[in-house]
Amino acid sequence: MIKVGIAGIGFMGWMHYLAYRERDDIQVTALCTRNQAKLDGDWTSIQGNFGPPGEQVDTSAMSKYQEVEALLANPELDVIDVCLPPHLHKSVCLAALEAGKHVFCEKPLALNDEDCDALVAAAEGAGLQLLVGHVLPFMPEFEFLYKAVQQGTYGKLLGGRFERVISDPLWLKDFYDMEKVGGPLIDLHVHDAHL
């Protein structure tokens, strides 16, 4: 059984929790948020512009923390799932790796190349897994595009134009803050650029 601790119980933390709940080989055993109501299991305030709204969650058997350092000190955890605002990703992921935990991080991994490279180097140096939550590669239309480019179905790819028609993420109040989130280019376009 893989034991996961989720850092950040907002919309993406909720989405990740729902995915874990469907698995027999993964168990969320710890939560970290500064919101006491969420630690107590009231996730009804969570909403986004896709997916189901939050609900009451039985957190009685989970370890609960308000500080990331305490979560990382839990010796029973195998994986830390980082669902915090993007400007916190590098520091929390690095601390988790230094604590000997595998890391699953909601995208973007960090706000610049140097920080991403530092995290990859830290994971490789520690012999730990670092996975970024890119979901689009698993969607049929993106699988098709990837195969078409790899196989040269339409010839050699010389360039690309990406256009995203989507509303701003309702759960990300700082969406346009370049220092905290990186704006739409980093937060959303990272999906397309990853491919």
Specify the residue positions occupied by each region the protein language model found.
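Nucleotide donor/acceptor-binding cores
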Residues: 2, 128, 155-158
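Predominantly a Rossmann-like dinucleotide-binding segment in NAD(P)-dependent oxidoreductases
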Residues: 136-195
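Rossmann-fold NAD(P)-binding glycine/threonine-rich loop
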Residues: 109-129
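Conserved G/P- and acidic residue-centered "switch" motifs that form tight phosphate/ATP-binding loops
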Residues: 8, 107, 152
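A short hydrophobic/small-residue beta-strand
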Residues: 103-104
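Rossmann-like NAD(P)(H) cofactor-binding subdomain of soluble oxidoreductases
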Residues: 88, 108-110, 131-138
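N-terminal glycine-/serine-/threonine-rich beta1-alpha1-beta2 phosphate-ribose binding loop
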Residues: 1-99, 117, 125
